[in-house]
Amino acid sequence: MTDYIADYRTWLQEEKHASDNTLSSYLRDINQFKTWLLGAGSPDLRRVKKDTINEYMLYLSGAGKSPATITRCTASLKSFYAYMLGRGAVKTNPAKNIAALKVERKCPEILTSKEVELFLEQPKCVDEKGYRDHAMLELLYATGIRVSELIGLDMGDVNLAGGFIRCRSKTRERIIPLYRTAIKALRDYITDIRPRIISGPDEQALFVNMNGGRMSRQGFWKIIKYYQEKAEIDKDITPHTLRHSFAVHLLENGADIRSIQEMLGHADISSTQIYTHVIKKQLKDVYNKAHPRA
């Protein structure tokens, strides 16, 4: 029998140029759906009807999955069956008219400017790890890039003389400026520290672990959690927290939302507009606390 999921993976990679995160999420959703079908006694992906998918959505809801997870799963199935339809493996897309659940967009956790300053002060430039970690955290807050983009940076993506980095994806590229402190932190790391810890002269990764290979997501996550504990900041800090804080602090200081959208790499302005809601909420909180008649 044709392995439709393997073929779909190739299609996502080669035709749709899907990001690694999209690829991982979609394939995980499709494989979980296939497992559920097998348990329901109907393992053939070609014989799925709209009612089958509705039943699966009810199963996910009953299993305690969040609306966001169920909505993403719906999108995964729509994409998979659009591919199947294009191949002639099915006559209709059974997921096409499945309504997505309304997902409440929560305001992201934001650090204050003082909390950011405290957090960035935690790595001490007294050894190789301290210099590297200091450079990573400064760069993350200076640019607002995603953690996947941070660990994916190569040496050729950094222009210290010009004061910017080049952030690439499979379909686009963006240029993001750096402030002076971040430039200095990067220069110190690149000039004095990185040559000592890379695995060999052919290593292209900007940030490497202490074994000399490219930094992993898990490794960077542990670094974030380590410095959160040291800073004693009573907030759940993740790699994305600095990205959110970067956007809100720029807005607070007068940056226009289109420029922030470009720096964050958001395809849709609505993804960036959530940060304006954060600021409005902060203003309302200040008003309610400070106004004598509030």
Language-model segment annotations:
Residues 1-294:
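Conserved catalytic core of the tyrosine transesterase superfamily
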